[in-house]
Swiss-Prot record:
Assembly: Interacts with the major capsid protein. Interacts with host IRF3; this interaction interferes with the recruitment of IRF3 to TBK1.
MF-aspect GO terms: DNA binding
Comp. bias (Basic residues): 105-122
Keywords on record: Acetylation, DNA-binding, Host-virus interaction, Inhibition of host innate immune response by virus, Inhibition of host IRF3 by virus, Inhibition of host RLR pathway by virus, Late protein, Viral immunoevasion, Viral release from host cell, Virion
Example GO biological process: symbiont-mediated suppression of host cytoplasmic pattern recognition receptor signaling pathway via inhibition of IRF3 activity
Name assigned to this protein: Structural protein p14.5
Family that this chain belongs to: Belongs to the asfivirus structural protein p14.5 family.
């Protein structure tokens, strides 16, 4: 026969991941084992037994909410993208310059730092 006077010890972790020893004590009134740190929770209502209709409706409600959120995110993503079109170069800008092949003089490229290019070394 089990000795209900000696508590059952177990390892528990707190929010800071520190491990300590907890103990289960026998509750003569409820005929169950409760953690010693749960004293005062006599009015605790346990989770009800599995009810397939409730869980199914909760699942369908959750699924509906997830679909709704996904639609909202899609709508937010499809906002006005005109501000980004300036980042895409025009087709004319993508064409290579064939000035030398056509016989035209090649254009001088602008220097990135005009002030620095004006100081020529002697």
């Amino acid at each position: 026969m089990a000795d209900f006077n000696s508590p059952i010890q177990y390892l528990k972790e707190d929010s800071r991941d520190r491990t300590s020893i907890g103990s289960l004590e026998y509750d003569e009134n409820a005929d169950t084992m409760i953690p010693s740190f749960a004293a005062g929770l006599e009015e605790f209502e346990p989770i009800p037994d599995f009810d397939p209709t409730t869980s199914t409706s909760l699942y369908s409600q959750l699924t509906h909410n997830m679909e709704k959120i996904a639609e909202e995110e899609d709508n937010n993503f499809l906002h006005d993208t005109r501000e980004f079109t300036s980042l895409v170069p025009d087709e004319a800008d993508n064409k290579p310059e064939d000035d030398e092949e056509s016989g035209a003089k090649p254009k001088k490229k602008k220097h990135l730092f005009p002030k620095l290019s004006s100081h020529k070394s002697k």
